[in-house]
Amino acid sequence: FNGIDSVIKMSEASVTPAVTIYPQNGRFIERDSLLLEKIGEIEGINHIHSVIQEPIVIKFKGSIRPVVIKGVSPHYIQQTDLQDKIVGGGAYLTSPEGEDAIIAGYGVAADMDLEFRRDNPILLCYPDKNANRASLSALSKIESRLAGIFSYNQEMDNKVMYADYKVGERLLKC
């Protein structure tokens, strides 16, 4: 009623799509470059991004926390204002050494006490589809490093992490 909700919506407007396409059946859509090209020709379409968004669990130094991972292309960072929202570290999804890197929300980073150190990987965990029980040992894990910390608003800061699209694909294929 005092306009604060408008300020919150504006703060995440560049990373929240105006149009989202979901599959009619199932959870996934195969990326079709010809279809994406056709969609891109529609008047008013500025950018098209394939995003894998899934709930996962992260593990760091013995702490475990659920988050929402957004697997995005490197172009996503340049075409949104994500790099302007970085409050620590950098805005990249692959380290200069070629390692997987993540950009974490401020709340996630603070809660997990994440560090910019190569010797302390962050484990991105997703249920192994071949496992027959629910436990930490039944999770597929990908090691990643902290590249940066962003701050949009409390809701996003407390639950979202960005990773390379290929990391999202690898997690889901486990």
Question: Language-model segments: which ranges?
Answer:
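Hydrophobic, regular-secondary-structure patches
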Residues: 1-68, 74-78, 85-97
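Short, intrinsically disordered, mixed-charge
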Residues: 9, 41-44, 110, 114, ...
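Extracytoplasmic
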Residues: 14-16, 62-67, 97-101, 117-119, ...
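Generic alpha-helical propensity signal that fires on short helical segments
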Residues: 22, 37-39, 63-68, 82-90, ...
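Solvent-exposed, non-transmembrane alpha-helical starts
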Residues: 27-34, 59-61, 77-82, 98, ...
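Extracytoplasmic segments of membrane-associated envelope/inner-membrane machinery
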Residues: 72, 80-121
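Short glycine-enriched loops at secondary-structure junctions
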Residues: 73-75, 166-167
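Basic-flanked hydrophobic alpha-helices used for secretion and membrane insertion
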Residues: 104-107, 117-174
